[in-house]
């Protein structure tokens, strides 16, 4: 799998587009040789995510340097933490982490909550225009794409249930699969795709559930979504987090990692999230 090493955010803010294209790598431009470097695994960074990590780096100053590795699919960031290729990662919610640990026999842990990113159902397109403007317009026999990894597929199915399109026979804290659908009055065809492909499928399906990670890079406007995930008693499992190895407090980077958490959990970063995500992400600390 192709990895793209990014400059730490001190320099990335100036040239992130170029770096993403050419896969260059570097560390922070800080001149303090005593600074501790912490390697952070992420997925594609939206402008808002870039801005909040820029703010974290600014708060940290020269004490800690953030060095980012950008991954192209969800299967890799946790493996990179487990194999000590990065020190921490920030890309997933609790449900995904718990499921990944079970499937891979690992014990990565959440060390900080960050935000919740409500997923949305988007209309398919035809001739460059949305086919539908509301859920009720989705016709009988329509095809709806959902992510195929267990946790995001489950989340997508619960979203479709909340939107009134299907019913599933399990509770909101259990992983739902297509086999758990107990009611499908419109005879919808639910198509499983890699999460990175759901947005690009909109030209060939009637609707798709798209994770926020891929919304902006696909040129989608979340304000045009047919349905938005609502907060309820089951929302905690969808909180995004910073993850590390279970022995992270014994590592040489422990003090630096704690400073990163403290920097992230400031009103300054909260303000950046609120001002730059335009409602796509909501702080949860």
Q: Where do the PLM segments sit?
A:
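C-terminal motif of bacterial Sec signal peptides marking the signal peptidase cleavage site
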Residues: 17-21
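Bacterial signal peptide processing site
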Residues: 23-25
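Flexible hinge/capping segments at coil-to-helix
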Residues: 30-36, 123-144
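Short, polar/charged alpha-helical segment
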Residues: 37-38, 42-69, 76, 80
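Short helix-initiation/N-cap motifs at beta->coil->alpha
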Residues: 68-79, 172-200
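Ligand-binding "clamshell"
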Residues: 99-111, 126-128, 204, 209, ...
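A bilobed periplasmic-binding-protein/Venus flytrap-type ligand-binding module shared by bacterial periplasmic
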Residues: 118-134, 238-254
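Periplasmic-binding protein-like
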Residues: 154-161, 262-284
């Amino acid at each position: 799998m192709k990895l793209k090493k990014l400059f730490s955010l001190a320099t990335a803010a100036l040239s992130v587009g170029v770096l993403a294209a050419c896969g260059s790598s570097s560390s922070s431009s800080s001149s303090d040789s005593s600074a501790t470097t912490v390697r952070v695994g992420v997925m594609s960074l939206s402008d808002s995510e870039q801005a909040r990590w820029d703010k974290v780096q600014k708060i940290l100053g020269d004490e800690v340097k953030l060095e980012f590795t950008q991954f192209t699919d969800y299967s890799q960031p946790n493996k990179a933490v487990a194999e000590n290729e990065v020190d921490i990662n920030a890309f997933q919610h609790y449900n995904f982490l718990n499921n990944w640990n079970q499937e891979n026999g690992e014990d990565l842990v959440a060390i900080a909550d960050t935000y919740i990113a409500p997923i949305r159902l988007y209309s398919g397109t035809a001739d460059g225009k949305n086919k539908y403007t509301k859920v009720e317009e989705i016709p009988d026999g329509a095809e709806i794409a959902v992510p195929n990894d267990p946790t995001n597929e489950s989340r997508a199915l619960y979203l479709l249930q909340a939107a009134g399109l299907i019913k599933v026979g399990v509770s909101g804290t259990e992983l739902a699969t297509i086999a758990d659908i107990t009611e499908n009055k419109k005879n919808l065809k639910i198509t499983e795709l890699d999460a990175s492909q759901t947005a690009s499928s909109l030209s060939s399906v009637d609707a798709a559930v798209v994770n926020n990670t891929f919304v902006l890079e696909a040129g989608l406007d979340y304000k045009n979504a047919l349905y938005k995930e609502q907060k309820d008693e089951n929302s905690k499992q969808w909180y995004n987090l910073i993850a590390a190895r279970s022995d992270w407090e014994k590592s040489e980077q422990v003090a630096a990692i704690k400073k990163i958490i403290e920097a992230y959990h400031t009103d300054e970063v909260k303000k950046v999230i609120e001002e730059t995500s335009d409602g796509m992400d909501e702080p949860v600390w």
